[in-house]
Amino acid sequence: MADIYFPQFDLIIEIDEPYHFSEEMLIRDQIRQNDIVQALNCKVYRVTISNNIEEVNKQVDEIVAGIQNRIINEKFVAWDLYSEYNPKTYIQKGYIDADDHPVFKAVSDCCNCFGAGYKGFQGSGTGHKFNSSIDIKALKFYPNGAWNNKLDADEEHFTEFHIDPEINEAYVEKRIHELRPELALFAHVKSDLGGYEYVFKGWYQLDKEKTKRLGKVAYRRISRIMPTYYPVSEESPNVIAMAFDKGREIGQFYDEGTVDTFHSRYPEYKVVLAEN
């Protein structure tokens, strides 16, 4: 658990009391910090507690000044816990971006970002309702029974691997020849707020050559952004524009304000008005 977490600023503050300074605690703190950064994609500031109260106050003042500066110079959006975990937040925007660190409490919520419309428990994923090339999948990237999946530090590549050679070989063949070649990936991680959650990592594509070479299923990320969809059972608003990256649709929009916000944030992507 972090000492102080400001989700509005992707910022965590850790208070280092004297007992943190042992070699063992320093190692444990570094491991924990790495886990937090991976899970929350945030910056960590540390306040070192000592007998010098002036020095402690100086550290605190510097952090407070930094937060105040961001409030003044950046567009401040208050954190809403309900919206943070609600698929509708991303459905209404028309896209989901891994750089925003979207998190969800259940696999069904992950699937619902792409129009699944699930009401209850869902296993580890499902097929995309609007794109027959994509599966939606939640994976654990830590020791997990017979599975040993690995996500690279830069999150551009990951592998799926079963420790039983026969099962692994069968899965490799099935993934290459039968299953959908692309994934909307969510990583199962320990939440800094307690429990576990699912973090969107992006849009990935099966790398067949690498898979054959490694003997384990390998993927590469093709986009951090994916379009979201209203449930198939609901009537959705009219799409007024779409965003593309190298010919791949990455967003669809229902109002001019969202189009303007997206275009301002991502000028490198092409926005095309929908035909009436």
Residue ranges and their predicted role:
Residues 98-197:
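Acidic, glycine-rich low-complexity segments with interspersed aromatic residues
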Residues 9, 181, 200-202:
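Core residues of folded domains in eukaryotic genome-function proteins
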Residues 34-95:
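Basic, glycine-rich
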Residues 16-19, 51, 189, 223:
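A short beta-strand motif that forms part of the nucleic acid-binding face
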Residues 73-137, 249-276:
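Charge-rich interaction segments
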Residues 193-275:
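Compact mixed alphabeta submodule
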Residues 21-23, 53-58, 197:
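Switch/connector loops and helix/strand junctions flanking conserved nucleotide-binding motifs
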Residues 1-31:
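Short beta-strand-loop-alpha-helix junction that forms the active-site gateway
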